[in-house]
């Protein structure tokens, strides 16, 4: 059937598939970032339960480093903020791609006309 379609419609279908793949990739990234946010939030909640002078250890690559509660809280809050910004950015990209997907879908349906139904 694809060989019967005009090149312009074939191109639009290819673009539609590409946009669909990008939306799926963004959804996966969004899910990963949300999981990282949840981890950070849980770690912060646990740190808040500790005494201010508690000894805390954190992973840095393959090392475990001794640090203060204050420094750990600060790093986790920075991480949460960064993740939140990335999540907002991904959501905006997702919205744009979803809009583009709908536009391409409509263009293809209009180009195919009553044959598609």
From Swiss-Prot:
Pfam families: Prefoldin_2. Molecular chaperone capable of stabilizing a range of proteins. Seems to fulfill an ATP-independent, HSP70-like function in archaeal de novo protein folding. The gene is pfdB. PANTHER family: PREFOLDIN SUBUNIT 1, PREFOLDIN SUBUNIT 1-RELATED. Keywords: Chaperone, Cytoplasm. One of its GO terms (biological process) is protein folding. Heterohexamer of two alpha and four beta subunits. GO terms for molecular function: protein folding chaperone; unfolded protein binding. It is found in: Cytoplasm. Signal peptide: none annotated. InterPro entries: PFD_beta-like, PfdB, Prefoldin. It comes from Methanosarcina acetivorans (strain ATCC 35395 / DSM 2834 / JCM 12185 / C2A). GO terms for cellular component: cytoplasm; prefoldin complex. Belongs to the prefoldin subunit beta family. This is Prefoldin subunit beta. The keyword Signal does not apply. Gene3D superfamilies: 1.10.287.370. It comes from the Archaea.
